[in-house]
């Protein structure tokens, strides 16, 4: 079988000093995405992608590890130094992910809660009976 000679187009390594860290913390998983100001993704990581499975995915420690992985990737590849943090969702990994980014040496300019709140939209799921 002949090898495809076209190959992938190399993306130019650009230097991005300011970025936005999007932390989506659901009850089951935590997704951390670091983007530039325009919203183009630079690096991302999830709790499940770091090897945590089942109920361990939704722990604060799993969110911390995901934030460290995404943060290191954005720092090493693009040189991101300052971030605005946007936190979405009610999950347990909210604060620990923000703390992990601060511990990596990021200067956190602002922390905003952008959790979507319905103005009486869809009917919520019924209460759990355990």
Swiss-Prot record:
This protein's UniProt keywords: Ribonucleoprotein, Ribosomal protein, RNA-binding, rRNA-binding
Gene Ontology CC terms: ribonucleoprotein complex; ribosome
One Pfam family per UniProt: Ribosomal_S11
UniProt xrefs under InterPro entries: Ribosomal_uS11 (IPR001971), Ribosomal_uS11_bac-type (IPR019981), Ribosomal_uS11_CS (IPR018102), Ribosomal_uS11_sf (IPR036967)
SUPFAM superfamilies (UniProt xref): Translational machinery components
Subunit and partners: Part of the 30S ribosomal subunit. Interacts with proteins S7 and S18. Binds to IF-3.
Protein name in the entry: Small ribosomal subunit protein uS11
Organism, as annotated: Psychrobacter sp. (strain PRwf-1)
